[in-house]
Amino acid sequence: MALFRKKDKYIRITPNNSLKGSVSHNVPEVPDELFAKCPACKHMIYKKDLGLAKICPTCSYNFRISAQERLTLTVDEGSFQELFTSIETKDPLRFPGYQEKLQKAKETTGLHEAVLTGKAMVKEQKIALAIMDSHFIMASMGTVVGEKITRLFELAIEENLPVVIFTASGGARMQEGIMSLMQMAKVSAAVKRHSNAGLFYLTILTDPTTGGVTASFAMEGDIILAEPQSLVGFAGRRVIETTVRENLPDDFQKAEFLQDHGFVDAIVKRTELRDKIAHLVAFHGGGQ
């Protein structure tokens, strides 16, 4: 009955396996380090167009930057003197994988811990400076972070210096348990002693500043500045919505929202922070 077989609707083509992979060899590869995708506007940006400040040319989004990059943008060239580098992070709870995570963070960032501390000059104004780096385990606050910031305030009291801190953190470091949480009280006590000495303390909130850092020294500055659109809060958005059973505003926990509600004194563009810091330090007695 082959004479009455229905004809196929489509022509059968046998694939040529020898052609497999030949196309991919002709497609040019673009190195990942050449471009960055803006988290806000989703545009692909040639990294050189971001500039030293790493600001999106399309929507002005502030990319997260390292402590070293922040240092370059802020202080007078060659003026930074790093302090407290000998303090080593321990693993008191023998938390699984913690030592490996610490080692990887050190290799990736070039830092000893999540905060860079020292003395520096900003437009000839001498300050005690701390810069938190979210690339180091999300700048979570462990015992060493708390100790370095506490010692910075104590040094500032001895040398009659204003303190400037760039905050960025995911909160307390869970791998260190209650010892991490105790840093909130320890640093806050140091802030109070510095304030009692009549010295100026300036905080700059950067993206993200959350958890125990927000609940302690980040919000204790005499003046609190923030970079545009920085995420600032204590608990996460979903946790709050689940707890209160309400939908939160779209801009909730953004720096602009906090300014509107009196928690932030001013939103300052990254490119203008250096001038603003120098002006505020000089206005409040200066650090000479």
Swiss-Prot record:
The keyword Protease does not apply. Residues 34-288 form the CoA carboxyltransferase N-terminal domain. It comes from the Bacteria. Its EC number is 2.1.3.15. Transmembrane segments: none annotated. Zn(2+) binds at residues 38, 41, 56, 59. This is Acetyl-coenzyme A carboxylase carboxyl transferase subunit beta. It comes from Streptococcus pyogenes serotype M1. The lineage of its organism: Bacteria, Bacillati, Bacillota, Bacilli, Lactobacillales.
